[in-house]
Design a protein with these regions (language model features):
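Short, charged recognition helix plus adjacent turn
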Residues: 77-105
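Short basic helix-loop element that most often maps to the first helix and adjoining turn
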Residues: 21-36, 97-104
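Short alpha-helical DNA-recognition segment
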Residues: 31-49
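A short, Lys/Arg-rich alpha-helix, primarily the initiator
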Residues: 5-29
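Short, basic-rich loop-to-helix N-cap that marks the start of a DNA-contacting helix
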Residues: 55-67
Length: 105
């Protein structure tokens, strides 16, 4: 079985790198060792290292576990909360009288 190749756009990679750096800084500010955070999050030390590097191959659940250990899980809820583009698209559809199609089962 061949390994699946993941293509990451440069902007996406920068965002992930920044997220990883922010997580690492939060850990260091709390004076928590990587070993302690990994243990409390129930993940391996290499997985935490990958998270702190912004790896796209780590599950979003693992990112959330680390954020919980650091007391930052509420930040996770802010992702896509204010969907400005989605609201504009919805308003544009309402203004033109378009309706959302219902799926018929």
């Amino acid at each position: 079985m061949s390994k699946k190749i993941i293509v990451i756009l440069p902007k996406t990679k920068r965002i992930l790198n920044e997220l990883g750096e922010n997580i690492k800084l939060a850990r260091l500010r709390r004076k928590l060792s990587a070993e302690k955070v990994a243990e409390r999050a129930n993940i391996s030390r290499p997985t935490l290292t990958s998270i702190e590097k912004g790896s796209p191959t780590v599950s979003i659940g693992s990112y959330l576990l680390v954020l919980q250990v650091l007391g930052l899980e509420k930040d996770f809820l802010l992702i896509a909360k204010d969907d400005e583009l989605g609201r504009k698209l919805q308003d544009a559809n309402l203004a033109t009288g378009q309706r959302v199609q219902k799926r018929i089962k």
